[in-house]
């Protein structure tokens, strides 16, 4: 087991609230919208689509409304039900429990209406609705030009393959046809989030994983002296959650930025790390030798990217304790009140982030 220095009582941890980290971003948005108003330009409009009268979804929608109002974004909630039919908590619970055979079609109609509405700039759908393939289907019919959550397959593919910049004309194109080939000759220290070349824009990332990245940037985990795209080099991070919504995308984002990431789930632990060079990448990782066609495809695809994407491999550690003890950053996302990361596992000066609705760390 890795030997690390344990936290000492004379060096208590420091608690940082996400609200303080978010404030500069909120101010920036508010200022930009203020400029648009001065120029008599339209204010961005976001539509939130609610499928069911479930308390968590309604609470999230109401929070979205307050957040938008605070910075000057126009926000509307589109519901599938008429409020006059749900007047109290008992009826709300009964309505939620009934099987609505029209629900998928109703949600789809609202999404299509928002897609067509030229006054709508962004669309947000409150999931889960059905779970599984039905929700995935609904995510794919949202116009990618209006998808503020980055759930469309186009954005998912870009995120996992480390494609950071796109041309608006590429939106909706098939995977493998959207690349950064025109940027390959540019210095990676010049092409970054603040210096996007003309004609390109940032690909949309899912909100919670991106929020975790912003938290890590704010506390100095990212090293700005290193080249953009490799500023987590030398850092070891444990992410305790591998959901398709947050945990897996987060592990991919962090490893694409150079970190060694231990991804811990309920029944397995895997390691996300930066993709190796072509020679190592083409080496067999199973009992089969890669075909010449696969090797050629790897080489062709690599040449079309500005930087490599991550790979997933077996983790050298077989238990979460060993992963946490070896980590500079520990990120908890377990939706269980009984799950706690023991303080004794966390090494001195490690950063801990909790994105679960429950407290995942001992206090």
Where are these regions (language model features)?
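Glycine-rich phosphate/diphosphate-binding loop of Rossmann-like nucleotide-binding domains
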Residues: 51-69, 172-341, 351
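Short glycine-rich anion-binding loops that position phosphate/pyrophosphate groups of nucleotides
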Residues: 126-132, 243-245, 335-338, 358-359
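Phosphate/diphosphate ligand-binding glycine-rich loop within oxidoreductases
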Residues: 78-205
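ADP-ribose/adenylate-binding Rossmann-like module
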Residues: 150, 332-334, 338, 344-363
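Positively charged, low-complexity intrinsically disordered leader regions
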Residues: 2-42, 49
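Structural alpha-helical scaffold elements that stabilize or flank donor/cofactor-binding regions
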Residues: 116, 322-324, 345
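Short beta-strand elements in bilobed, periplasmic/extracellular small-molecule ligand-binding domains
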Residues: 65-98, 261-265, 270
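Glycine-rich phosphate/diphosphate-binding loops that line cofactor/substrate pockets in enzymes
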Residues: 33-44, 113-119, 230-231
């Amino acid at each position: 087991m890795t030997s690390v220095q344990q936290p000492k009582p004379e060096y208590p941890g420091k608690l940082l609230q996400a609200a303080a980290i978010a404030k500069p971003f909120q101010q920036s948005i508010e200022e930009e919208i203020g400029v648009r108003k001065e120029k008599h330009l339209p204010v961005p409009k976001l539509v939130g689509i609610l499928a069911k009268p479930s308390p968590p979804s309604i609470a999230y929608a109401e929070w979205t409304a307050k957040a938008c109002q605070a910075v000057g974004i126009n926000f509307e909630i589109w519901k599938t039900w008429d409020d006059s039919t749900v007047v109290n908590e008992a009826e709300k619970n009964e309505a939620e429990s009934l099987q609505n055979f029209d629900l998928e079609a109703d949600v789809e109609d609202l999404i299509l209406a928002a897609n067509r509405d030229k006054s709508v700039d962004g669309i947000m759908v409150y999931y889960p609705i059905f779970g599984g393939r039905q929700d995935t289907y609904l995510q794919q019919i949202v116009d990618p030009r209006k998808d503020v959550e980055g759930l469309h397959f186009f954005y998912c593919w870009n995120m996992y393959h480390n494609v950071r910049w796109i041309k608006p004309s590429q939106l909706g194109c098939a995977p493998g046809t959207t690349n950064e080939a025109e940027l390959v000759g540019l210095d990676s220290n010049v092409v970054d989030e603040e210096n996007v070349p003309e004609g390109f824009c940032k690909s949309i990332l899912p909100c919670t994983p991106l929020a975790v990245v912003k938290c890590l940037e704010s506390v100095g985990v990212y090293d700005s002296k290193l080249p953009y795209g490799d500023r987590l080099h030398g850092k070891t991070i444990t992410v305790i959650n591998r959901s398709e919504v947050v945990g897996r995308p987060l592990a991919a984002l962090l490893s694409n930025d150079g970190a060694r990431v231990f991804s811990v789930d309920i029944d397995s632990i895997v390691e996300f790390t930066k993709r190796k060079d072509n020679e190592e990448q083409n080496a067999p990782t199973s009992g089969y030798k890669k075909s010449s066609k696969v090797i050629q495809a790897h080489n062709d695809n690599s040449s079309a990217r500005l930087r490599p994407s991550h790979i997933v491999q077996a983790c050298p550690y077989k238990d979460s304790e060993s992963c946490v003890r070896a980590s500079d950053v520990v990120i908890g996302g377990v939706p269980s009140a009984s799950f706690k990361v023991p303080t004794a596992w966390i090494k001195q000066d490690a950063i801990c982030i909790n994105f679960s609705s429950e407290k995942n760390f001992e206090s």
